[in-house]
Design a protein with these regions (language model features):
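Exposed beta-sheet edge and beta->alpha loop/turn motif
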Residues: 94-141
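Short solvent-exposed beta->alpha transition segments
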Residues: 54-105
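Short hydrophobic/aromatic segments of transmembrane alpha-helices and their interfaces
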Residues: 38, 56, 115-117
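Sec-dependent bacterial lipoprotein signal peptides
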Residues: 1-19
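Hydrophobic membrane-targeting alpha-helices
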Residues: 16-20, 24, 80
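Short, low-complexity N-terminal intrinsically disordered segments enriched in polar/charged residues
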Residues: 21-50
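Internal amphipathic alpha-helical segments of the cytochrome P450 catalytic fold
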Residues: 18, 53-54, 133
Length: 141
């Protein structure tokens, strides 16, 4: 189960890397509001840092729930938080649009750079155009 969640996160990260564009340069899909994407992304970051793995899992859309569990989310985040330390504050944030090449599905992502006690973490929280949580990525920097 952990491997499936890691694959989902790796696929999401690959989408960013394969897009060939600067992450901050892509407009959100039509109908998506940057403020809403950021607000929802901040809620997920707060839940992740508060240890509410079940709530994060329950917000994932059905296809993402098939490859994740509260335990895989917990394991994923604890590994990163051990390196970065406790959350301190948000440093920078923006919303960007992306597209899954294989399916053509457009989605919006909240990108939040946050300071922690030891290191910073860049959070990417992806939402469908219906504002369903598609996936998360947390990269220690």
């Amino acid at each position: 189960m952990r491997k499936k969640f890691a694959l989902l996160l790796a696929a999401l990260a690959a989408l960013f890397l394969l897009s060939g564009c600067k992450v901050s340069g892509n407009p959100l899909p039509e109908g998506m509001e940057g403020d809403t994407v950021l607000e929802q992304g901040r809620e997920i970051v707060a839940l992740l840092n508060g240890g509410d793995w079940q709530e994060v899992y329950s917000r994932l859309r059905a296809d993402a729930q098939e490859t994740a569990s509260p335990e895989t989310i917990q394991s994923y985040m604890e590994e990163r938080l051990e390196k970065a330390g406790a959350y301190k504050e948000e440093d920078e944030a923006f919303a960007t649009g992306q597209k899954i090449k294989e399916t053509g599905e457009e989605y919006g992502t909240a990108v939040l750079y946050c300071k922690h006690e030891k290191k910073s973490i860049m959070y990417r929280v992806a939402y469908s155009t219906d504002m369903e949580l598609m996936g998360i990525e947390a990269r220690v920097r």
